[in-house]
Each structure stands twice: as structure tokens, then as C-alpha cells.
């Protein structure tokens, strides 16, 4: 069975990356700073992804394991045994995650194996924000080997996760509620060699153009829905998005965006 490692076990890591990898037949290792999340995933041995608006697309995600960053040897083995790696820790935590991975590689040694890490954050220059501190923290020998054999690319996140009501969150703390969006474009230019086939992952030649488009469309539309929904008293993004009065505002927003 193919294997993947995800640095981060938050909502996007579980509810988007984890789901796509599971549906593509991968065994998944999660690495997270939160011991409660790691313990919960190991205890439940999986979780359920709820797709808003279409429960027929829901899926269980099983065949997983999780570690905190303290499990350095286990993480090292999982990284070099994996067919693909992802990072989804939150943009402000990229440097810390990079330092943790560098510490592990410095401890056990970089291997001359082709690997690709895809950074999945709503963050400017996400791949560079991870690669720069990682490279700096590696020893000279490990830096040369790691740099030669490891590609660090980035993806545009088009799916968001929402917070369920208090009762559901308490009853199913491991589960994730996400938008019904199934596309993960990745910067092909930063990939070394090739990556395995993964459901909904698309390697793009002109990644920069798509990233700019996404900033103006997906991010803006979510902001409009969230802000107007808040003003009208909604607490769930999907409920706000389905309201005719908000849809009309969104249509006018798209008209302005398309003029850019």
C-alpha cells in the first residue's frame, strides 16, 4: 500500500488532504504538535468527513496513525517510507514545523531518495516560507543531500472547513465538516521527478496565474459570505451561502472581480 505523511492534523489536514489520500488508497501518518489530537486519532483509529450540502460524498478516513513531533525516529521512518508528504500546519507555524523536520533529519541523516513535500496553506510564498528555515537549519552535509533529492512545492487550497454546532463537536470531536470542493492544484515546477496519482490533485504549469486568480475569487467570495452572513445572524458558512440575498451580493462581487 502507498503511504503518505501529513505534517499537521487540523481541519484541512484531516478534512481535505487526509480524505483525498484515503480515497486514493494511501495509508496516512499525521504529525501534530497537539497531543490531545494525536491521542484522539490513535484512539478512534480514524474519523468521518462530512461534506456540507451532499452527505453522499461523506467518507470515513481509516488506516491512519498519528505522532507528536517528539516521536522523532517514527517520523523519520514515516517520512522516508512515504510516497508523498504534505504540510498543513497554518502559515504562522511553517517555520517551527520546518525546524522540527530539520532536527529529525540532522539526527538520523538525509537519505538519497527522491521525495516531494507539498505545502498546503493560505499563505503568501508558502513553499519558500517552509523551505528557507528548513534549509537553514540542516547541517551542510544533510542540506546538500536533502536539497538534491527533495522537492518542496505548494498547493492552492480551495476547500475550507467549518465549525459544527457545539453538540456535534462534543459528540464527534475527531470529525471534520468541509465544503463540497474537490480540486487541489499544485505547482509542477517545484516537483522533483513525479508524484503518485492522488484524487483531485492537478499539477499546474502556470501555477502563479492560478494562485492570483484564487486570491481574487475564492478568498474574496468566502470573505463576502462570511461577513454578510455574520451581519445577518448566520453562524454556519453553508447556510449563509445558500441565502438568496447573499447570493445576489456575491454575484455582484464576481462581476467586479472579473473586471480585474
Which residues make up each language-model segment?
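Substrate/ligand-engaging "lid" and interaction regions
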Residues: 1-7, 11-260
Amino acid at each position: 500500500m502507498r503511504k503518505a505523511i501529513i505534517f499537521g492534523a487540523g481541519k484541512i489536514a484531516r478534512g481535505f488532504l487526509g480524505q483525498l489520500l484515503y480515497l486514493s488508497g494511501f495509508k496516512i501518518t499525521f504529525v501534530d504538535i497537539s497531543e490531545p489530537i494525536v491521542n484522539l486519532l490513535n484512539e478512534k483509529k480514524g474519523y468521518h468527513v462530512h461534506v456540507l450540502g451532499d452527505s453522499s460524498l461523506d467518507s470515513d478516513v481509516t488506516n491512519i496513525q498519528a505522532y507528536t513531533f517528539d516521536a522523532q525516529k517514527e517520523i523519520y521512518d514515516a517520512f522516508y517510507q512515504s510516497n508523498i508528504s504534505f504540510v498543513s500546519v497554518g502559515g504562522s507555524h511553517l517555520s517551527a514545523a520546518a525546524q522540527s523536520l530539520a532536527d529529525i533529519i540532522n539526527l538520523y541523516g538525509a537519505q538519497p531518495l527522491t521525495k516531494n513535500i507539498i505545502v498546503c496553506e493560505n499563505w503568501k510564498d508558502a513553499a519558500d516560507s517552509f523551505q528557507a528555515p528548513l534549509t537553514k537549519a540542516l547541517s551542510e552535509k544533510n542540506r546538500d543531500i536533502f536539497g538534491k533529492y527533495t522537492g518542496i512545492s505548494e498547493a492552492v487550497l480551495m476547500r475550507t472547513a467549518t465549525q459544527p454546532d457545539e453538540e456535534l463537536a462534543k459528540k464527534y470531536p475527531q470529525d471534520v465538516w468541509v465544503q463540497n470542493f474537490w480540486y487541489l492544484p499544485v505547482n509542477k515546477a517545484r516537483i522533483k521527478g513525479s508524484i503518485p496519482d492522488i484524487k483531485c490533485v492537478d499539477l499546474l504549469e502556470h501555477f502563479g496565474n492560478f494562485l492570483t486568480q484564487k486570491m481574487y475569487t475564492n478568498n474574496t467570495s468566502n470573505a463576502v459570505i462570511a461577513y454578510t452572513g455574520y451581519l445577518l445572524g448566520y453562524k454556519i458558512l453553508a447556510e449563509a451561502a445558500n441565502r438568496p440575498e447573499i447570493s445576489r451580493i456575491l454575484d455582484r462581487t464576481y462581476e467586479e472581480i472579473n473586471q480585474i
